[in-house]
Structure formats: C-alpha cells, structure tokens
C-alpha cells in the first residue's frame, strides 16, 4: 500500500500544479489581449475622430 500511495499523491499534486499553471497562463493571456484590444480600440477611435474632424473642416 505505501508503495502505491506516494506516486498517486504526486500525480494528484502535479495535476493541481498543472491546472494552476494553465489557469494563470489563460488569465495572463486574456488580460494582455483585453488591454491590447482596449488600447487599439481607443487609438482607432481617436484617429477616426481626428480624421472625421479634419475632413469636416
């Protein structure tokens, strides 16, 4: 029984660690993507506003 116990525990621990890493990676990627998207949207909106303002004059 003790021969089976440590590998099972290690596998479980590794699974938790892997899950944490994946969750963290997904969170970081989504945060960066969101921030970049917001920044690009703001820049695009600003340039579009400036373009329309320049052309209206």
Swiss-Prot record:
GO BP terms: namely: symbiont-mediated suppression of host NF-kappaB cascade
Intravirion-facing ranges? 30-57
Which keywords are on file for this protein?
Host cell membrane, Host membrane, Host-virus interaction, Inhibition of host NF-kappa-B by virus, Membrane, Transmembrane, Transmembrane helix, Virion
Per the UniProt record, which residue ranges are transmembrane?
9-29
* A Pfam family it matches: SH
Disulfide connectivity for this sequence is none
Q: What InterPro entries does the record tag this protein with? A: SH
Main localisation: virion
Per UniProt, what is the membrane topology? Answer: Single-pass membrane protein
Instruction: Give the Virion surface compartment stretches of this protein.
Output: 1-8
Cell location:
Virion membrane; Host cell membrane
Tell me the domain of life. Answer: Viruses
Query: Its GO CC terms?
Result: host cell plasma membrane; membrane; virion membrane
Q: What does this protein do?
A: Plays a role in the inhibition of the host NF-kappa-B pathway. This inhibition occurs at the receptor level, by preventing the signaling of TNFR1 as well as IL-1R and TLR3.
- Membership in a protein family: Belongs to the rubulavirus small hydrophobic protein family.
Assembly and interactions? Interacts with host TNFRSF1A, RIPK1 and IRAK1; these interactions interfere with host NF-kappa-B activation at the level of receptor complexes. Interacts with host protein UBQLN4.
Protein name as it appears in the record: Small hydrophobic protein
């Amino acid at each position: 029984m003790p021969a089976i116990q440590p590998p099972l525990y290690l596998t479980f621990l590794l699974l938790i660690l892997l899950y944490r890493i994946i969750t963290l990676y997904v969170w970081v990627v989504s945060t960066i993507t969101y921030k970049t998207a917001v920044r690009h949207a703001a820049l695009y909106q600003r340039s579009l506003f400036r373009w329309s303002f320049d052309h209206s004059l």
